[in-house]
Amino acid sequence: MNLQDNIRIVEGFPKKGISFKDITTLIRDKDAFKYAVDKIAGYLKDKNIDVVVGPEARGFLFGAPIAYTLGAGFVPVRKQGKLPYDTLSIKYDLEYGSDVLQIHKDAINKGDRVALVDDLLATGGTTSSVVKLIEQAGGEIVTIDFVIELTDLKGREKLKGYDVLSLIKYDI
């Protein structure tokens, strides 16, 4: 299956000059969604993953079903103030300003084998921040997996030393 056929391209969203890769058409198509989840889960099946981590919000869409398929736990990474218990936090820069990501302090055990799963790799800023949170919690990142990678933005360079998988690659 060519997953790229299931991605809608929206020009000028969220602002002029951007060619937005819309995954809602992929997750709406039961065969494409299952294929994407199965491809990543298949890649992870022999890696003894304890926990799949998914960043808010679209990382939840792929991370949770992959964790279920593997028989692993799922850990959500949320924006500040969304988790009800003690958290670990990291501040990261956005194009205009900054934001804070958090996980529960007890969500990852020391030595847990972790797969980080998200929908899209662009500049790598958010992903590298999540990597720091996972490592701060004591997790061992086994692999970082994406449905889409925007190769021209060179996010993979911020993830050197990690095993990175992407199912679809776009030159923007």
UniProtKB/Swiss-Prot annotation:
Enzyme class, spelled out: transferase
Alphabetic keyword roster: Cytoplasm, Glycosyltransferase, Purine salvage, Transferase
Chief subcellular location: cytoplasm
InterPro entries in the cross-refs: Ade_phspho_trans (IPR005764), PRibTrfase_dom (IPR000836), PRTase-like (IPR029057), UPRTase/APRTase (IPR050054)
Reaction catalyzed: AMP + diphosphate = 5-phospho-alpha-D-ribose 1-diphosphate + adenine
GO molecular function: adenine binding; adenine phosphoribosyltransferase activity; AMP binding
Pathway(s) it belongs to: Purine metabolism; AMP biosynthesis via salvage pathway; AMP from adenine: step 1/1
GO biological process, one term: AMP salvage
Domain of life: Bacteria
A Pfam family it matches: Pribosyltran
One GO CC term, this protein: cytoplasm
EC numbers, comma separated: 2.4.2.7
SUPFAM superfamilies (alphabetical): PRTase-like
Protein localization: Cytoplasm
Function: Catalyzes a salvage reaction resulting in the formation of AMP, that is energically less costly than de novo synthesis.
Subunit structure: Homodimer.
Alphabetized HAMAP family for the sequence: Aden_phosphoribosyltr
Similarity section: Belongs to the purine/pyrimidine phosphoribosyltransferase family.
Protein name: Adenine phosphoribosyltransferase
UniProt source species: Clostridium kluyveri (strain ATCC 8527 / DSM 555 / NBRC 12016 / NCIMB 10680 / K1)
The organism's taxonomic lineage, starting at the top: Bacteria, Bacillati, Bacillota, Clostridia, Eubacteriales
Gene name of this polypeptide: apt
